[in-house]
Amino acid sequence: MASKRRSSLARVVPLRRARPEPAPAVATPENLNPYDFARLQFNRAADHLGLDPGIRDLLSQPKRQLTVSIPIRMDNKRVKVFTGYRVQHSIARGPSKGGIRFHPGVTLDEVKALAMWMTWKCAVVNIPFGGAKGGVTVDPKKLSMDENERLTRRYTSEISIILGHDRDIPAPDVYTTPQHMAWIMDTFSMTQGFSTLGVVTGKPIPLGGSAGRNEATAEGCFVAIEEAAKRMRLPLKGATAAVQGFGNAGSFVAKFLEEAGAKVVAVSDSRGGIYEKKGLRYDLITAAKEKKGTVTAARGQKISNAELLELPVDILVPAALEGAITRENAARVKAKIVAEAANGPTTPDADDILRSNGTVVIPDILANAGGVTVSYFEWVQDLYSFFWDPDVVRNHLEKTIRRAYEDVAETARRHDTDLRTGALILAVGRVEETTRLRGLFP
């Protein structure tokens, strides 16, 4: 790892569109669904910017949303129908970009929220994409490999009307892999009559994938942690850390922290966690995970995911799903730095509590932006058929995240607010500027 590794916002003619569905009758920040949660965050930033009501209305809802039925023939020869979604929040700054997740808890509101967050994430790191997200309501663990392939290909065919390297570019997300991306690329290419490598990122390297994409989210998160620690005068060597979630992002963050001399004392996955005050060894955890399917098979004191969040550590990395830190447990979070490798792991009420307790929260739209940053690099490489060495990818990623952190910190300082609100102010301001410059058609 190379390190040790306003524009002024003029008012415009109000832009009116149909209002989104109303929030629940009793809606506190803690019980909002993900989409209302995302809009609440957006509105806080919009208030700081004094955003024009028309622009606010436009950016608070998706540009396009597609719900599809996905019939596939199961291995037992019976037909089963799944529900899938693809939401494009904004294309003001370029093609829409965002992952596809296969999970039994996927809902339209969740996908809409994730698409909005992708818009802000791309704007924070200043890459020329808008935000999108996709998902299928399914438990992929209950599908065979052949069923996974048929589901992926049929889903791709259903949403292909809005895909394209210059329109909407998917990527891996929860329970989707480079193999799923290969199936998407191939299916879309068959409808075009030629290979279109740039229609999707996160692909296997032989199909136009980028070096460094697999660990990009974690590497970006680690660089953001470095920046936060530097500003707090917290040496990473000897610092303690806990990582909730040991998938792609969480496992690599743990690895990079260990390499920097930090002591990773706890990790967890969906089955629970382990704790060792003297520090866990990354190689032993991954070996246990590969052999038994869970980190709890490694040696260490068994703890729950909830207990992990409340450990007395310097750095906490929530790298699982949304809503891990809430008003119920936020006051018991003892970490000095919370680096959100997951999307939306901290609720608005919890954010307020952490802020009042002096915890530095590196928001998801900055902390986990490494993935989409290297996806952008992959897209560029595919368009030009010119592929970069791993060190080139790593250096560009590190430079991008450090510059983004500086931009966010400066915006937060200027507005006398926290990093999350600073990141949103920065991102919303950039999207507002391009929206205003483009104007309205017709």
Predicted regions and their residues:
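Glycine/serine-rich phosphate-binding loop and adjoining beta1-alpha1 elements at the start
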Residues: 103, 123-237
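Adenosine-phosphate binding glycine-rich loop
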Residues: 26-32, 228-229, 331-442
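Glycine-rich, N-terminal phosphate-binding loop and its surrounding beta-alpha-beta segment
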Residues: 68-140
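Rossmann-like adenosine-cofactor binding region
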Residues: 272-361
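Short, Gly/Pro- and small/polar-rich lid/capping loops
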Residues: 26-69
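Glycine-rich phosphate/diphosphate-binding loop of Rossmann-like nucleotide-binding domains
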Residues: 204, 209-313
